[in-house]
UniProtKB/Swiss-Prot annotation:
Pseudouridine synthase that catalyzes pseudouridylation of RNAs. The active site is at residue 156. It comes from Schizosaccharomyces pombe (strain 972 / ATCC 24843) (Fission yeast). Belongs to the pseudouridine synthase RluA family. PROSITE patterns: PSI_RLU. PANTHER family: MITOCHONDRIAL RNA PSEUDOURIDINE SYNTHASE, PSEUDOURIDYLATE SYNTHASE RPUSD2. This is Pseudouridylate synthase C18B11.02c. One of its GO terms (biological process) is enzyme-directed rRNA pseudouridine synthesis. InterPro entries: PsdUridine_synth_cat_dom_sf, PsdUridine_synth_RluA-like_CS, PsdUridine_synth_RluC/D, PsdUridine_synth_RsuA/RluA, RluA_PseudoU_synthase. It catalyses: a uridine in RNA = a pseudouridine in RNA. Keywords: Isomerase.
């Protein structure tokens, strides 16, 4: 029986810092290895690569196959090789990882079973897509000399704050039970557009449905999964509010979508506070059809970086000409027009550190046995400092 070979997860792991707020990984060669999927059976090797892996320009995979960079069952394949059940397909590629924030992964607590961290915004948790070494898991393994870790809770790449990792599958299962327990209390802070109600707790019980998985788009929908969040305003600075968020369920993008639905989206959220996608209402009360929202979001994703392009118009004093110049500059930041001299891959420009996160932070997790908390991020403290009536966060 064919087996996928083991690999050193930190092979070629090297970090470069230039003092510009970014952590970089120099390009390196990497062997992508996978078992054939059921939907691949009976298709040619070239057909599989052209339909399943679209991160390369047209013609790249045919050239890679003809150059011997693609193997089937450890044998060099050709464009007409038919994929069958049990086949192992590999691709030797020059890998270019996107830069991430250079902020360190803070250790909140560590014992023989768990590591509790303060995750920086803009860093994915585990290898996915174009990210491999520029992930929380590999950073912990490389810089903190941690052995193999198992994530126990999930934070989006753009979100910062508390995360739990176990050091064994057994400990991971024990923590998983904690995480789904209704006795577990979670607290987040978010900085949102506008003056959030100051009338005590605001509860949102709107159900959530993933309407476009490839775009990461979730919306309020009657056929969605049950979701419940308790919100409370902490401070208001005249433009934005700092809101304490207590999720009672754990749905994808729950806090981001509930805040948008209430009319107070996270101020720099590239999806749910984007006027080009949602229009002037920014999706309040679920306004906008799925079809129109998906179409606009898809178009923006093809031409622009995942950044809150228009969100600051309510917050800055820039002229219309300055705003247009800023937008035009962003339009060219996705691809530079240059190519790697070694592999021909189109090169992306670097994001600014501000584009690597949103104003959403996992602040505190508490069970009957333990309690862990991080410091408030600077963007949250900034709001509190501007409001003399800001409430304390216990």
């Amino acid at each position: 029986m064919l087996k996928r070979p083991k690999r050193d997860p930190l092979k070629d792991c090297e970090y470069v810092f230039k003092g510009d707020g970014l952590r970089r990984v120099p390009p390196y060669y990497y062997e992508y290895i996978t078992f054939a999927k059921l939907r691949w059976y009976g298709k040619t090797l070239l057909e599989v690569f052209n339909t399943e892996f679209r991160d390369r320009e047209s013609g790249y995979y045919e050239k890679a196959i003809r150059n011997g960079q693609v193997k089937v069952n450890n044998q060099i394949g050709n464009v007409d090789t038919l994929i069958e059940n049990g086949y192992i397909v590999s691709h030797h590629a020059h890998r270019h990882e996107p830069p991430v924030s250079d902020q360190p992964v803070g250790i909140v607590h560590e014992d023989e079973s768990y590591v509790v961290i303060d995750k920086p915004a803009g860093v994915p948790v585990h290898p996915t897509g174009r990210y491999n070494h520029n992930t929380v898991l590999h950073i912990l393994m490389k810089e903190n000399k941690c052995s193999l870790l198992y994530p126990c809770n999930r934070l989006d790449r753009l979100t910062s704050g508390l995360m739990f990792f176990s050091k064994s599958p057994k400990a991971a299962e024990e923590m998983r039970v904690h995480m789904i327990s209704k006795s577990l209390k979670k607290e987040y802070v978010a900085r949102v557009i506008g003056e959030f109600p100051n009338s005590g707790e605001v509860i949102c019980d709107a159900p959530l449905l993933t309407v476009a998985p490839t775009l990461g788009l979730n919306r309020i929908h009657p056929d969605g999964k049950e979701a419940s969040t308790v919100f409370k305003r902490i401070a208001f600075d005249g433009h934005t509010s700092l809101v304490l968020c207590k999720p009672l369920t754990g749905r994808t993008h729950q806090l981001r979508v509930h805040l948008q639905y209430l009319g107070y989206p996270i101020a720099n959220d590239p999806i749910y506070a984007n006027k080009r996608v949602w229009g002037p209402s920014l999706g309040k009360n679920g306004e906008g059809s799925n079809e129109s929202v998906i179409m606009r979001l898809s178009e923006i994703g093809k031409t622009e970086t995942a950044s809150p392009l228009l969100q600051y118009e309510w917050y800055t004093n820039e002229t219309e000409a300055e705003a247009k110049a800023r937008r035009d500059k962003r339009l060219g930041e996705l691809l530079t027009g240059k190519h790697c001299s070694e592999c021909g891959t189109p090169l992306y420009s670097d994001p600014s550190p501000e584009e690597l996160g949103i104003w959403l932070h996992a602040l505190k997790y508490e069970s009957k046995d333990w309690s862990y908390k991080t410091q408030l991020p600077k963007w949250a403290l900034d709001v509190c400092c501007r409001d003399p009536n800001a409430l304390p966060i216990e």
